[in-house]
Each structure stands twice: as C-alpha cells, then as structure tokens.
C-alpha cells in the first residue's frame, strides 16, 4: 500500500478507519485511490487492500 507516494503498512480496515487512526478529519480531505476520487459518503464502505495507491489531500484554512 502506498499513501501520497510513500510506502505505508497495509491497514486491514475501511478507509474511514484509516483516516481516523492517522488523525485526518474526513470532512477536510479528498481521497483518490487508483486514479478515482472516493466520495466521502463511501469512506466507511471502502475496504483497503495491500496493493492500494492512495492520495490524501488535506484542506487547511488560513488567512
């Protein structure tokens, strides 16, 4: 499994569980897996696999 272009240990769970475990707020991220955007409503249904390539974009506020 790779996350943002870096090797990551395979996580046996859902995308939502992965995001929560790694400190991401699911309402502040966009996730792409294998070239396709995963809509937020699907995060809890998407099972992660050892060969997944994820890109997680985290939005930050500021001014």
Pin down the residues of each PLM region.
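Ubiquitin-like/PB1-type beta-grasp interaction modules and other compact soluble beta-rich domains
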Residues: 1-62
């Amino acid at each position: 499994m790779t996350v943002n272009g870096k090797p990551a240990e395979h996580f046996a769970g859902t995308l939502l569980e992965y995001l929560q475990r790694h400190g991401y707020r699911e309402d502040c991220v966009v996730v792409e897996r294998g070239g396709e955007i995963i809509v937020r409503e699907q995060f809890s249904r998407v099972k992660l696999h050892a060969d997944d390539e994820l890109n997680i974009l985290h939005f930050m506020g500021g001014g």
